[in-house]
């Protein structure tokens, strides 16, 4: 908008300063004149085309008579016209500033919407153009009053003229024509009518400006009643600017009327004084209103600052409260998670106890049926009064159901490698034998279930393990594994050469021989190795792949290996071929201690399912044969600090570290089982996870400890922190579930005398079964002499139920009337089947 008004003023100023001769020469129809017209499309901020046409016509009508006179008159008129245009520009700038503060000026480019200010300006410029026209100059040259000083007609219809102080005189030597003198009255009348119209128009504009001023004052009064401090201040500023613009407009109009129009009417001094006082009063009132609004604005700003401070404080308090509540919720969530974990653990323990109790009851029932069947057969064949031959403590070998009894659910045997120095290790061979080690001047003595001398044969070792192997035909789970340092003969004891087979070939031969004596079983074989904590199938058709070990579904229990192949074995020859295939796929390597060292743990699992009476269909026994990799020191094995770029040395070091960690985890499991801890860390390694079914409740584990000839190997077997603790002092259990100290041995290998001795030991009455171990009771066999008195009734033992599991029991708790001093059974068993000391 500023550019538009500035351009308009510049055009008017240039139009009236043009040389008179050039203006006269430029005709409307001149080609040069038409060539100078602007081309292209019109700018949107320019006035309407009709206004441009009117201004162009006014400019063309101003033609001086000659060059000299036009120059002289142009200079005289330029001074007053420039002053008027400067005032007009000042007024327009103030007016535009007020309009922009209100929200922007109106669009002048729209057709038919020419502002009234431009109309007044065009009329004023038309008057100026008439003064510069030949007729106006003739009037000036004739000595008449200029057009700006023409008075409007009087009320009686006559016109009067006033001489300006600076009137022009006629130029000497220039005569006036008769025609000009004749047209003078007509011209004066036309000028008088034009001045009257102009005066009326200007007075109308003044009235409009006054009305706008009154409207702005009314708007200012309404603004005083407003509530918003910021809007009031903006409105005051806007009204102030608009008031200034109106004052400038009024002053400009007055100056134009005083300079170009008729003189203002003479007012009395008293009226002027009253008007001045009224204006001063209005000004004072406006100033007072402004000050009041400013004071109100300051008060509201103070209130706003206070509210902002309160809001900030409230936000901080709310944020702190939310954070505190969030922390409390996190704490409660952590507590709920821990409680949920404990509840899940208690539920799992309870399920394990229920499953174990069910299995033990089924085993006891099956065993009792077999014994009853054998007793009935013996009585029917021998008649009444038949007694067993001297030296025979059980049913003969050919009778169905005749199997050697177990001597405990955890048994530890020790075998010395030939060539062991007697200065380092001294033994007392036989059942309940002792092993005494001497290392760095310190002697330690271990008592084990059985100690084999260095010259013991493979047959002697297997003869002691045969009862445990054959017990899997009655539905038991048996695990036999060897433990020792690298080079102590573990693989030799388990496999053995073809001419002198070890435990595995002899156990398989004994099982198939026993099954061939009239029993029908289905034999399933699986073989895996644990290499660097990776479980691989050694009997898979393709290359060995890593298998995933998972917990079995709820209600079934056990450990499941996804993708493991199970093979049905029809005969012994096929079984040996498959075992040979599995051994060839096992990871072995040469170390500084052994030419062919096993670098992984091998686990052979045989599952035997009975399919004919007297065993019910579905009864299954499991035999786990484990060949553990030897524990070793990295320095002695040649794997300590391998040089860079030696992949074999780095691989040996990693294998040794993994083997030692898994054996240490196995030692932790054994220690937990020995101490009857409620939690057994089976998940510490893949080895213990796979052995969890073999080391759980109702199973039998036989550990064959291999001791080498060197001093370092003796040290490895007796250093518990860094190696798997040798389970020599582990407690073993009788066939009826009684716990017997590992440091005391039975006086004889006879099952009858061993059972009598175990139940008659002084410290046996105070022992308790480990948590979760419910073992089946074995029948009491007759002996030539009277048995030792029992310290407590022969019954199924159970461990204290965990608190989380006890809370979930819904069965009624009853006390056993036959055992005074007893407390209610958490399992809700009927009287006489449960006994528990306070």
From Swiss-Prot:
ATP binds at residues 484-491. Residues 409-740 form the Kinesin motor domain. It is found in: Cytoplasm, Cytoskeleton. GO terms for cellular component: cytoplasm; dendrite cytoplasm; kinesin complex; microtubule. GO terms for biological process: anterograde dendritic transport of neurotransmitter receptor complex; axon guidance; synaptic vesicle transport. Keywords: ATP-binding, Coiled coil, Cytoplasm, Cytoskeleton, Microtubule, Motor protein, Nucleotide-binding. Its main location: cytoplasm. GO terms for molecular function: ATP binding; ATP hydrolysis activity; microtubule binding; plus-end-directed microtubule motor activity. Residues 186-351 form a coiled coil. Residues 23-32 have a biased composition (Low complexity). It holds the Pfam family Kinesin. InterPro entries: Kinesin-like_fam, Kinesin_motor_CS, Kinesin_motor_dom, Kinesin_motor_dom_sf, P-loop_NTPase. Residues 23-48, 140-185, 718-792 are annotated as: Disordered. Residues 156-167 have a biased composition (Polar residues). May play a role in microtubule-dependent retrograde axonal transport. May function as the motor for the transport of multivesicular body (MVB)-like organelles in dendrites. Belongs to the TRAFAC class myosin-kinesin ATPase superfamily. Kinesin family. PANTHER family: KINESIN-LIKE PROTEIN KIFC3, KINESIN-LIKE PROTEIN KLP-3. This is Kinesin-like protein KIFC2. It comes from Homo sapiens (Human). The gene is KIFC2.
């Amino acid at each position: 908008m500023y550019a538009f008004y500035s351009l308009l003023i510049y055009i008017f100023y240039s139009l009236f300063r043009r040389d008179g001769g050039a203006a006269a020469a430029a005709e409307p129809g001149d080609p040069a004149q038409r060539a100078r017209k602007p081309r292209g499309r019109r700018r949107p901020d320019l006035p309407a085309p009709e206004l441009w046409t009117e201004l162009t016509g006014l400019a063309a009508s101003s033609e001086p008579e000659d060059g000299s006179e036009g120059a002289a008159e142009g200079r005289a008129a330029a001074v007053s016209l420039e002053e008027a245009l400067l005032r007009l520009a000042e007024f327009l700038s103030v007016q535009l500033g007020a309009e922009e503060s209100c929200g922007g000026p109106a669009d002048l480019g729209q057709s038919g919407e020419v502002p009234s200010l431009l109309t007044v300006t065009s009329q004023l410029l038309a008057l100026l153009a008439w003064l510069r026209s030949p007729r106006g100059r003739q009037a000036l040259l004739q000595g008449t009053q200029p057009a700006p000083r023409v008075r409007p007609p009087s009320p009686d219809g006559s016109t009067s003229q006033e001489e300006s102080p600076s009137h022009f005189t006629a130029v000497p030597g220039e005569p006036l024509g008769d025609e000009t003198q004749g047209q003078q009255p007509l011209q004066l009348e036309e000028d008088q009518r034009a001045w009257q119209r102009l005066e009326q128009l200007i007075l109308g504009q003044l009235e409009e400006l006054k009305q706008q001023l009154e409207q702005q004052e009314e708007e200012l009064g309404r603004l005083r009643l407003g509530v918003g401090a910021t809007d009031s201040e903006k409105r005051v500023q806007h009204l102030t600017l608009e008031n200034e613009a109106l004052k400038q407009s009024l002053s400009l109009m007055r100056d134009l009327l005083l300079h170009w129009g008729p003189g203002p009417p003479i007012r009395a001094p008293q009226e002027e004084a009253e008007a001045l006082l009224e204006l001063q009063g209005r000004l004072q009132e406006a100033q007072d209103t402004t000050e009041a609004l400013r004071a109100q604005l300051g008060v509201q700003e103070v209130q706003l600052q206070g509210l902002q401070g309160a809001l900030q404080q409230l936000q901080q308090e709310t944020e702190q409260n939310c954070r505190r509540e969030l922390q409390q919720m996190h704490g409660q969530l952590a507590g709920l998670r821990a409680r949920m974990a404990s509840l899940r653990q208690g539920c799992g323990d309870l399920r394990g106890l229920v499953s174990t109790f069910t299995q033990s009851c089924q085993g006891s029932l099956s065993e009792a049926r077999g014994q009853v069947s054998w007793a009935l057969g013996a009585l029917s064949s021998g008649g009444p009064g038949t007694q067993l031959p001297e030296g025979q403590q059980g049913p003969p070998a050919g009778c169905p159901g005749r199997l050697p009894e177990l001597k405990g659910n955890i048994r530890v045997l020790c075998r010395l490698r030939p060539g062991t120095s007697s200065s380092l290790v001294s033994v007392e061979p036989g059942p309940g034998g002792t092993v005494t080690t001497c290392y760095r001047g310190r002697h330690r003595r271990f008592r084990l279930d059985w100690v084999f001398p260095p010259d013991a044969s493979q047959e002697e070792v297997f003869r002691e393990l045969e009862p445990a192997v054959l017990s899997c035909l009655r539905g038991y789970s048996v695990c036999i594994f060897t433990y020792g340092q690298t080079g102590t003969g573990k693989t030799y004891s388990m496999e053995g050469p073809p001419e002198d087979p070890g435990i595995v070939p002899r156990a398989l031969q004994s099982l198939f021989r026993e099954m061939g004596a009239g029993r029908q079983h289905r034999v399933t074989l699986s073989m895996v190795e644990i290499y660097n904590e990776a479980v691989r199938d050694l009997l898979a058709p393709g290359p060995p792949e890593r298998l995933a070990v998972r917990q079995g579904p709820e209600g079934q229990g056990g450990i499941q290996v996804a993708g493991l192949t199970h093979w049905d074995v029809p005969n012994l020859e096929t079984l040996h071929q498959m075992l040979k295939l599995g051994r060839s796929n096992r990871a072995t390597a040469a170390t500084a201690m052994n030419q062919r060292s096993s670098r992984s743990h091998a686990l052979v699992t045989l599952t035997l399912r009975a399919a004919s009476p007297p065993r019910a269909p579905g009864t299954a026994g499991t035999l786990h044969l484990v060949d553990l990799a030897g524990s070793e020191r990295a320095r002695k094995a040649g794997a300590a600090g391998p040089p860079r770029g030696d992949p074999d040395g780095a691989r040996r070091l990693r294998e040794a570290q993994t083997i030692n960690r898994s054996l240490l985890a196995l030692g932790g499991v054994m220690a937990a089982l020995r101490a009857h801890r409620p939690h057994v860390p089976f998940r510490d390694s893949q080895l213990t996870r796979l052995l969890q079914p073999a080391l759980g409740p109702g199973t039998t584990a036989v550990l064959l400890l291999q001791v080498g000839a060197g001093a370092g190997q003796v040290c490895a077997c007796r250093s518990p922190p860094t190696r798997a603790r040798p389970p020599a002092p582990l407690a073993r259990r009788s066939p009826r579930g009684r716990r017997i100290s590992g440091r005391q041995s039975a006086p004889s290998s006879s099952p009858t005398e061993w059972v009598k001795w175990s139940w008659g030991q002084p410290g046996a009455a105070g022992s308790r079964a480990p948590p979760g171990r419910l073992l089946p009771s074995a029948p009491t066999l007759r002996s030539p002499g009277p048995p030792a008195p029992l310290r407590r009734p022969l019954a199924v033992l159970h461990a204290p139920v965990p608190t989380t599991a006890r809370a979930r029991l819904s069965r009624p708790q009853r006390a056993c009337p036959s055992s005074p001093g007893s407390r209610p059974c958490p399992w809700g068993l009927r009287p006489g089947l449960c006994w528990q000391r306070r």
